Amino acid sequence: MGLCKCPKRLVTNQFCFEHRVNVCEHCMVQSHPKCIVQSYLQWLRDSDYISNCTLCGTTLEQGDCVRLVCYHVFHWDCLNARQAALPANTAPRGHQCPACSVEIFPNANLVSPVADALKSFLSQVNWGRNGLGLALLSEEQSSSLKAIKPKVASQAAVSNMTKVHHIHSGGERERTKPNGHDAVSPHSVLLMDAFNPPSAGDYASSRRPLLPRQSPIGGTDRDDNKYQRRTPAELFSRWTRRFYAPSSRPPWRRTWFLVTAGILAFVLFVYLMAWLGRGGSDAVDEGWNNPNPQPNHYE
């Protein structure tokens, strides 16, 4: 489990394979609507992923996408065509995820931003309204709704814009909503509302910490190198810095560490000096303690 980087700071075990960060359900809807998100344990077992729709094989960047309650993402047009082809009397449990066979329709008592976003898509088609227990739409209403893109309910909280930066093999590409303008910028996720409009060229957050944050033990950029293999020198340095780092730990811990290290160093020094001194006197003692000395014969 990890902590999401959004202002809500929620604890979650869901992990974005593309950006390699922990994400909560609010971030899935607002900042990662087309990213591959599964559990962190699944990412540890296999970090490879394909950012394509499993129904049509094309990239998820093309067209509107919908995320099911199992967190699998598909093109809405592909999923709608697949489920609409089923018989009209298909039970709600018969509509299942193409990837994991989990029921598409969320439970009525489920409180989830992902479920709310999914319901907004399902309410646009008759097979979805049938599973949700809503009244069916007429042909005129269904045709008019096809021209209107479904709006995600949670996007109302973001009044100005939501920027999501995706890293591809050819470089970095910025996708801006809702106008869809593309530009090149460094990787980050910025959420800005109408109450705090950004200045020209300045997209920094207006929040300032009350107290200056200390650099974490083991490096300043922990998110980029926390999955790299550590060398023995780095592990030893990290272990020793825990005793020297100024924090709320009791002061006697540092003193105990210094005293213990000094005693061990002194014992090691005495042992080495005794071993070296005993090795030089062995040759002399062997001649005096030999009961049958052999005289040297000179020719």
Curated annotation (Swiss-Prot):
Domain of life: Eukaryota
Gene Ontology MF terms: zinc ion binding
Membrane topology type: Single-pass membrane protein
ZnF (RING-type) ranges: 53-101
Classification via SUPFAM superfamilies: RING/U-box
Main location group: membrane
Sequence segments annotated as region (Disordered): 200-231
Residue(s) carrying Phosphoserine: S215
Compartments it resides in: Membrane
Transmembrane segments: 256-276
UniProt similarity note: Belongs to the ZFPL1 family.
ZnF locations on chain (B box-type): 1-43
Cellular-component GO terms for this entry: endomembrane system; Golgi apparatus; membrane
PROSITE patterns, sorted: ZF_RING_2
Protein name per Swiss-Prot or TrEMBL: Zinc finger protein-like 1 homolog
SMART domains, A to Z: RING
Keyword Membrane tagged: yes
Protein's organism: Drosophila melanogaster
Assigned keywords, A-Z: Membrane, Metal-binding, Phosphoprotein, Transmembrane, Transmembrane helix, Zinc, Zinc-finger
